[in-house]
Amino acid sequence: MKQGIHPDFQKVVFMDSATGAKFLAGSTLKPEETVDYEGETYPLVRVEVSSDSHPFYTGKQKFAQADGRIEKFNKKYGLKK
C-alpha cells in the first residue's frame, strides 16, 4: 500500500435528522460540527435518512405499484378474484 494517499479514518457520529437517532461508526468524512456521545466528543454527520427512519427498516413500506400490476395481469388473462 502506498503511504500518504489514503484519507484519515476516524470515528464519527451519524445523526438522523428525522428521528434524532445517533449512530457511532467509522468514516473518512471530516465534518466541522462535533457532538458529545457516550462521554466522548466526536465529529457529527447529519443524514436525512438512516435505518431508524427508512420505511424498509421501520416496516412501513407501501406496495402501491405492485397492486396495479397484479390487477393488470388479472384483467389481461381474465382471472377473477
Curated annotation (Swiss-Prot):
Disulfide bonds: none annotated. Pfam families: Ribosomal_L31. The keyword Ribonucleoprotein applies. PROSITE patterns: RIBOSOMAL_L31. The keyword Ribosomal protein applies. InterPro entries: Ribosomal_bL28/bL31-like_sf (IPR034704), Ribosomal_bL31 (IPR002150), Ribosomal_bL31_B (IPR027493), Ribosomal_bL31_sf (IPR042105). It comes from the Bacteria. One of its GO terms (molecular function) is structural constituent of ribosome. GO terms for cellular component: ribonucleoprotein complex; ribosome. Part of the 50S ribosomal subunit. PANTHER family: 50S RIBOSOMAL PROTEIN L31, CHLOROPLASTIC (PTHR33280), LARGE RIBOSOMAL SUBUNIT PROTEIN BL31C (PTHR33280:SF1). This is Large ribosomal subunit protein bL31B.
